[in-house]
């Protein structure tokens, strides 16, 4: 399932009738239920599942999966990632990007210095941060760079098709 994106994880069992806690990775936790079908990793393969219900419980969310009717059935699914097909995600306005689209992009300075490749992103209070794995032959001996994702000030240009991000950044940092 190459065109999928993980949007959450099944948590602990709730009750005796097969309900499971849901850890949502979406901005609005309840919006995870806007996507159907879900896919979960089961015995090394993605398996499509259907929900028969969900509800808020205390400060979290719980769901009921079709065919999962006992605590034991639910226990087998705890910790499973929840994925949806990426074409189900809403289109973003120009200049906004899903993190998954930025991971793997080459990062180059405005002066042409190859900084490395985006390996992940981190969310901070003020802005997201690109984690860039430096090239093996990095002249500054860097292994990893943390570059703030500040549009126009640091991030000068993003070309998702070419998998390239141009930044105004000192290679020594």
Swiss-Prot record:
<dbReference type="GO" id="GO:0005737">
    <property type="term" value="C:cytoplasm"/>
</dbReference>
<dbReference type="Pfam" id="PF01782">
    <property type="entry name" value="RimM"/>
</dbReference>
<dbReference type="Pfam" id="PF24986">
    <property type="entry name" value="PRC_RimM"/>
</dbReference>
<dbReference type="GO" id="GO:0005840">
    <property type="term" value="C:ribosome"/>
</dbReference>
<dbReference type="GO" id="GO:0006364">
    <property type="term" value="P:rRNA processing"/>
</dbReference>
<feature type="domain" description="PRC barrel">
    <location>
        <begin position="93"/>
        <end position="173"/>
    </location>
</feature>
<protein>
    <recommendedName>
        <fullName>Ribosome maturation factor RimM</fullName>
    </recommendedName>
</protein>
<keyword id="KW-0963">Cytoplasm</keyword>
<keyword id="KW-0690">Ribosome biogenesis</keyword>
<comment type="subunit">
    <text>Binds ribosomal protein uS19.</text>
</comment>
<dbReference type="InterPro" id="IPR009000">
    <property type="entry name" value="Transl_B-barrel_sf"/>
</dbReference>
<dbReference type="GO" id="GO:0042274">
    <property type="term" value="P:ribosomal small subunit biogenesis"/>
</dbReference>
<dbReference type="GO" id="GO:0043022">
    <property type="term" value="F:ribosome binding"/>
</dbReference>
<dbReference type="InterPro" id="IPR011033">
    <property type="entry name" value="PRC_barrel-like_sf"/>
</dbReference>
<keyword id="KW-0143">Chaperone</keyword>
<keyword id="KW-0698">rRNA processing</keyword>
<comment type="function">
    <text>An accessory protein needed during the final step in the assembly of 30S ribosomal subunit, possibly for assembly of the head region. Essential for efficient processing of 16S rRNA. May be needed both before and after RbfA during the maturation of 16S rRNA. It has affinity for free ribosomal 30S subunits but not for 70S ribosomes.</text>
</comment>
<dbReference type="InterPro" id="IPR056792">
    <property type="entry name" value="PRC_RimM"/>
</dbReference>
<dbReference type="InterPro" id="IPR002676">
    <property type="entry name" value="RimM_N"/>
</dbReference>
<dbReference type="InterPro" id="IPR011961">
    <property type="entry name" value="RimM"/>
</dbReference>
<comment type="similarity">
    <text>Belongs to the RimM family.</text>
</comment>
<dbReference type="InterPro" id="IPR036976">
    <property type="entry name" value="RimM_N_sf"/>
</dbReference>
